[in-house]
A protein has these predicted regions:
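Contiguous, glycine/small-aliphatic-enriched amphipathic segments in soluble metabolic enzymes
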Residues: 1-139, 182-266, 270-284, 290-295, ...
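Short, flexible loop segments at boundaries between secondary-structure elements
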Residues: 145-161, 288-304
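Ligand-binding beta-strand-loop-alpha-helix segment within the catalytic cores
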Residues: 156-186
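Glycine/threonine-rich beta-strand-loop-alpha-helix active-site module
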Residues: 131-153
């Protein structure tokens, strides 16, 4: 391993927009002429070369067998495809899912071997993963399993707005049932540590409420009184600066204006709607609690526009 860093790029499902946005994002770095690291793309070689020919024909890339043989900066790719992969643009299929899954498996192995220093992921299709009978259907779950990391944390970054997710891909009913004082306290302690690692000496956290108007004293539910307020009180006694529950219709606005350093979102859509409404294209997702930092786009495979040159690549960049 040299002093140079190597970042693994996982374009995601090859039937979707992942290959297009990965190539477009890498093209910008290549055109700037100052690559900050070696970017190692784990992809179906034929489809990656096709994407390069369509969207970045002048971009210089090289094929590598392993990231360990790469010295210096540049754009490289490692072939994870099979020659007989029957992958059609815009079509959800088990073949495409298996190709994306092989890329994840190979990249995580290289991380474990110390050859990759960070991961950037494009979108995969959860329905395709089910068709392929792959156990974990999301990147976060797959990476957590591969690295034996039991408690990965999802952080959304949208300009100056930061959102931590207490739950992710659960139904709303499951997310509500998962509200628990002890678990919220543990979650608050963990994200406080992560915020300090990100450079916030005394992070000021906001807790999003579950019910309208934070239940208005119990008029619209009792989760705030039973669970959220006791958890916030416990965290403050531990020296963590966190608010009482604040209505979700205002807490994200307040954080975007700098009143809070980060917001605790209780369920998937609560934070996703806020971030994507604020700036859909520039929202990125980071997964903390893994051996390396993983960043990701905040959108899906967009099969309806796949391989048509229409996809925005800002989030991937």
């Amino acid at each position: 391993m040299t002093g140079r860093r190597r970042f693994g790029v996982l374009p995601g499902d090859p039937a979707g927009i992942g290959y297009e946005i990965a190539v477009k994002a890498l093209r910008e770095y290549d055109e700037a002429g100052a690559l900050p690291a070696a970017f190692v793309v784990y992809a179906h070689a034929g489809l990656f070369e096709l994407a390069r020919a369509r969207y970045a024909p002048k971009m210089q890339i090289a094929r590598a067998r392993t990231p360990g043989e790469i010295d210096g900066t540049g754009i490289y790719y490692i072939d994870v495809g099979y020659g007989d992969d029957d992958i059609a643009p815009g079509v959800v299929s088990a073949q495409a899912a298996r190709c994306a899954h092989r890329a994840i498996e190979r990249c995580t192995l290289d991380v474990t071997n110390g050859d990759i220093d960070g991961i950037c992921t494009g979108p995969i299709h959860k329905g395709a993963m089910r068709l392929a009978n792959i156990g974990e259907i999301g990147h976060t779950e797959m990476l957590a399993h591969a690295f034996d990391a039991p408690n990965p944390i999802t952080l959304f970054l949208t300009n100056d707005l930061r959102i931590f997710f207490y739950t992710r891909h659960w139904s709303l009913r499951q997310a509500i049932d998962a509200l628990d004082v002890e678990q919220l306290v543990a979650f608050g302690e963990t994200i406080n540590v992560h915020m300090r690692q990100l450079g916030f000496a005394s992070p000021h956290l906001a807790l999003a409420a579950l019910n309208p108007h934070a239940s208005d004293g119990g008029q619209f539910g009792d989760e705030e009184e039973r669970i959220l307020v006791p958890a916030a009180n416990r965290l403050r006694r531990l020296g963590i600066d966190i608010s009482d529950p604040i209505g979700a219709d205002s807490v994200f606005y307040l954080a975007s204006r700098g009143k809070y350093d980060a917001v605790v979102s209780l369920y998937h859509d609560q934070g996703h709607i806020a971030a994507k409404t604020y700036d859909f294209d520039r929202t990125i997702s980071a997964t903390l609690g893994l051996p390396v930092l993983r960043t990701s786009v905040d959108h899906g495979t967009a099969m309806d526009i796949a391989w048509r040159g229409m996809a925005q690549h800002v989030s991937m960049k």
